[in-house]
């Protein structure tokens, strides 16, 4: 179930503040965040966010087609190591 349209999209206030601070400066630094639940706004395009995956911060460069999605969608939290191999070479 999606978010109600009357509420609008969500983004952490601290994240919006950090983006607004960097809009004035020429140098764009990586914005570190733990807010995976924040929606990507059009004002985020061109910025790099370091999104926390539970272990480390993974850099995500925001492009135009990412607008409307959540930051956490682009950083997986689980690493797949493969299924256990079924060793049938050793016979009885």
Curated annotation (Swiss-Prot):
Keywords: Ribonucleoprotein, Ribosomal protein, RNA-binding, rRNA-binding. One of its GO terms (cellular component) is cytoplasm. Gene3D superfamilies: 30s Ribosomal Protein S19, Chain A. GO terms for molecular function: rRNA binding; structural constituent of ribosome. It holds the Pfam family Ribosomal_S19. GO terms for biological process: ribosomal small subunit assembly; translation. SUPFAM superfamilies: Ribosomal protein S19. Protein S19 forms a complex with S13 that binds strongly to the 16S ribosomal RNA. NCBIfam families: rpsS_bact. Belongs to the universal ribosomal protein uS19 family. This is Small ribosomal subunit protein uS19.
């Amino acid at each position: 179930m999606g978010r109600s349209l009357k509420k609008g999209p969500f983004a952490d206030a601290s994240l919006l503040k950090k983006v607004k601070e960097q809009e004035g400066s020429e140098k764009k630094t990586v914005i570190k965040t733990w807010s995976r639940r924040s929606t990507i706004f059009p004002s985020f395009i061109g910025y790099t966010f370091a999104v926390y995956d539970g272990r480390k911060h993974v850099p995500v460069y925001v492009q135009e087609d990412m607008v409307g999605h959540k930051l956490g969608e682009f950083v997986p939290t689980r690493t797949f190591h493969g299924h256990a191999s079924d060793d049938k070479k050793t016979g009885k």
